[in-house]
Amino acid sequence: MLKSAVRSAFYTELTATEDAYFTPVEQPFRSPSCSISASDVYPAMLRLVALLAALCAVTQGCPTILTKSQWGGRAPTCRTAMATPVTYVVIHHTEGTACSTQSACITQAKNIQNYHINSNGWCDIGYNFLVGEDGNAYEGRGWTSVGAHAPNYNSNSIGISVFGSFMNYNPNTAAQNAVKNLISCGVSRGYIKSAYILKGHRNVTATDCPGNTFYNTVRTWPRFQA
């Protein structure tokens, strides 16, 4: 929808600018005189540049992020604000069932949130975001709330967990791209430092998370530090 709106605005602006340049004068047989000043055209060109930048951001920016209200998550019982931009991004797997459709991922998100609140006694789902093999991201605590996913790092990190257990295989390409795009999105929006440090969960506490195979892949990503 957003892409369509930007394209529509772009072509409307383009048409207006073309008209400004190419509409013939009313009396074509007289000596031509241009009635268009730079002050008429220049603002239109600036708007075109802005629209092109917006279209580029939509095309290359954030993955689809379902807000907590969109996936039907419970409201948190408490919240601690997190100072941004954060230094660390910590990658997890849920060590549960993978999902490749939005409906299946929503079911998993609700199950995990219920477990974290009801069994762990936490305020909310522990992760800042979750990612499915449907290529979507699912908001957990979001960009500006301290998570409960990595001891000693929670207050200065974004925790991203992929639905599934990845000891013996990787998440699919859609999920991996969504994780990478989510990180880039956080950087571009000012929530993650451009010089962030990427870690696997096992780098900050004793665990096999995010699974052996996926961890070996994450190690090859930019800005990884064990």
Residue ranges and their predicted role:
Residues 83-117:
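Active-site acidic/histidine clusters and adjacent loop/turn architecture
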Residues 1-4, 30-52:
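Classical eukaryotic N-terminal signal peptides for Sec-dependent ER targeting/secretion
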Residues 120-123, 133:
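Glycine-/small-residue-enriched capping loops at alpha/beta junctions
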Residues 46-50, 58-96, 132-226:
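Basic/polar, cationic surfaces and motifs that engage anionic cell-wall
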Residues 6, 14-16:
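Intrinsically disordered, low-complexity segments enriched in serine/proline and basic residues
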